[in-house]
Curated annotation (Swiss-Prot):
1-deoxy-D-xylulose 5-phosphate binds at K160, S186, E187, S246, H269, S282, N287, K288, E291. Transmembrane segments: none annotated. This is 1-deoxy-D-xylulose 5-phosphate reductoisomerase. It holds the Pfam family DXP_reductoisom. The keyword Transport does not apply. NADPH binds at T30, G31, S32, I33, Q63, N159, E161, G275. Mn(2+) binds at D185, E187, E291. It comes from Rhodopirellula baltica (strain DSM 10527 / NCIMB 13988 / SH1). GO terms for biological process: isopentenyl diphosphate biosynthetic process, methylerythritol 4-phosphate pathway involved in terpenoid biosynthetic process. Residues 205-233 are annotated as: Disordered. Pathway: Isoprenoid biosynthesis; isopentenyl diphosphate biosynthesis via DXP pathway; isopentenyl diphosphate from 1-deoxy-D-xylulose 5-phosphate: step 1/6. The gene is dxr.
Amino acid sequence: MPAESISADSVPDFRSTNRPVSRVAVLGATGSIGVAALDVIENLNRCDPDFAWEVSSMSGHSQIDPLIELAGGCHTPPKCVVVSDAEMEAQAAKALRTASTQTSSRLTERCRLDVGPDALVRAATENDVDVVVAAIVGRAGLESTLAAVHAGKRVALANKETLVVAGPVVTRAAANNGAQLLPVDSEHSAIFQCLAESRARQSQYATAKQSIQPESVRATDPPSSTTDSPAKTHWPGVRRLILTASGGPFRDWTTAQMREATIEQALAHPTWKMGAKITIDSASMMNKALEVIEAKWLFDVPADKIEVVVHPQSLIHSLVEFEDGSLIAQVSPPDMRIPIQYALTYPRRLPCPAPELDRSQAWDMSLCPADPDRFPALALGFEVARVGGTAGAVVNAANETAVDLFLHGQIRFTDIPEICRRTLLDHDHESSPTLERLLKLDVWARARARELAQI
C-alpha cells in the first residue's frame, strides 16, 4: 500500500457535531514541533468523535509575522497570542491589529496580546487549558513547563531540557499536583508505548498482591515497596530501555573529519527537519545524550538500564527489552505529528495527518552500537544520568552556549562536547539542589563555557 496522508474523504468529519472542547496552549508555536502540533490539532478537530479541539493560546519569541500568520490560520483563533521577547511588543501589537482587519486571517480584535517571559507562565496555567504543548527550545522553556505541571495540566513534553535541568523537581511536582507528563520526543513516546505491557503487568501484580495479603496488611502497606529498584518497581519484567539514534549527518565520519566540519554540513540532517540548535545536537549526538538523561527522569530508571543504538532509517523509534529476552519496538514513519498526537489524545488513537509506511516496498531496518569514542557527548550523557543532581543543568547550559558559539563560527564542531565536559568538571556537584540553585548554576555554566571557548 503506497504511503499517503489522510484525506478529507477518508475519515468522518465531526465538526458539525456537538462535542466538549479540549483546549490546548502551544508554547513554541513557530518552531518545527509547534507547527506540527497546530496541524495535528486542526486535524483532530475534524476527525475526533469525542472532542472538539481548539488552540487557546500560542507563543513565539521574536518571529512575529509567522506567529500571527499561524494564529490567523486556526479554525478557531486563539484568544491570546504570546510574544516572550518583551522588546517585540510594539511590532507584535501592530501585526495583530493589521491581521484582525484582513479577510485572509481569522483573527479578530478579541484576540489579545500578552508579552514577556511571565506571559508564557500565564498561558500555561489558564484555568480552561487542558493540555500544554511544551515546545520551547532549550532552558527557556523550563519555567512555563514547570508552571503547567504545578497547575496539574497534561503536558505534551517536547522540551527535553526541562527534565535535563530540573528532572527531580519536575517529576516530584507532577506527582504532587496530579499532572501528566507525556513525551513528544519520538524516542520517549516510543518507549512509553512499548511499556504498555509492563504497565498492565504492574496493575495486575498490585491487584494480585493485595488480594493475597491479610486485611490488616492491606490497610497499611502500598502494593509495592518504593525501596525496590525503580526498574523493577515501576516496570515489572523490563530489562532495559533502548533509544534509537539516526546517527545524524556525521554518522560515518571520523573524528578528524568532524574536526573540520562546517556549519552547513552539521545542519544537513539526513532524516528530520528541525531547528538549528537541535540539528547541531543531533550531529554531535548531544541530543541523544540529553534524551538518556530525560529517559532516566521520565521513566524513573537508572542509567545502566538505558542503551543507545544507531538506526539510520529512523523507522524504529525505540525498543524495550524484557527479562525473557523479548523486544518490543515502536515503528512508524519519521513524522513528529505521530508522537505529538499520541501525547494529546492518549490513550486514544485516532487518524493522524502523517503518511503511512509504504508497505508495498521492502523495509530496510538496521541497528548497530553507538560509538562513544567518536561521539563523546553520548558518554557524557550517561555520566550525567548516573550522577544526577546539578550535572544536568551545567551540561545543558554549557551545550546551549557551545552550540551558539559554533553556529557563529567561533569554535570547531568538536569543541562542543569538550567545552561541556570541562564545564562539568569545573563545577561543585550537588546531589539535591533546589530549583533556585539550578537556575544560578545555569547562569554560571554559560559564562564558564564562554571562558573555556577563549582559552
